Amino acid sequence: MIYYLSYIRNGGQFMHTFLIVLLIIDCIALITVVLLQEGKSSGLSGAISGGAEQLFGKQKQRGVDLFLNRLTIILSILFFVLMICISYLGM
């Protein structure tokens, strides 16, 4: 993969633009997925009174929450990989 990136680095304006477009799409998707997730805290009143239930209660994520959590992890990893590739091509 490093050889491929160094090959593209020499004449890779198209690849650089393509990776930037992928990064923008990934950023928009990551922001959307994070905003779709349910809040895990009750705000300030939950921190004062009802925080023990969240701390000691074990609730597993199911369904949509689990899917959004995993999708957030995947999109975050993709974000960092794209950033590393773009910075390598920019050298």
Curated annotation (Swiss-Prot):
Membrane topology label: Multi-pass membrane protein
GO-annotated cellular components: plasma membrane
Pfam families registered for this protein in UniProt: SecG (PF03840)
Subcellular location: Cell membrane
Record InterPro entries: SecG
Disruption phenotype: Grows normally, a double secG/secY2 mutant enters stationary phase earlier. Significant differences in the export pattern of a number of extracellular proteins are seen in a secG deletion; the double secG/secY2 mutant exacerbates this effect (shown in RN4220). Single or double deletions are as virulent as wild-type (shown in RN4220 and SH1000).
UniProt keyword list: Cell membrane, Membrane, Protein transport, Translocation, Transmembrane, Transmembrane helix, Transport
Coiled coil (residue ranges): none
GO biological process, one term: intracellular protein transmembrane transport
Molecular function via GO: protein-transporting ATPase activity
Assembly: Component of the Sec protein translocase complex. Heterotrimer consisting of SecY, SecE and SecG subunits. The heterotrimers can form oligomers, although 1 heterotrimer is thought to be able to translocate proteins. Interacts with SecDF, and other proteins may be involved. The channel interacts with SecA via subunit SecY. Also part of the accessory SecA2/SecY2 protein translocation apparatus required to export cell wall protein GspB.
Family named by the database record: Belongs to the SecG family.
Protein name as annotated: Protein translocase subunit SecG
Source organism of the structure: Staphylococcus aureus (strain NCTC 8325 / PS 47)
Upper lineage: Bacteria, Bacillati, Bacillota, Bacilli, Bacillales
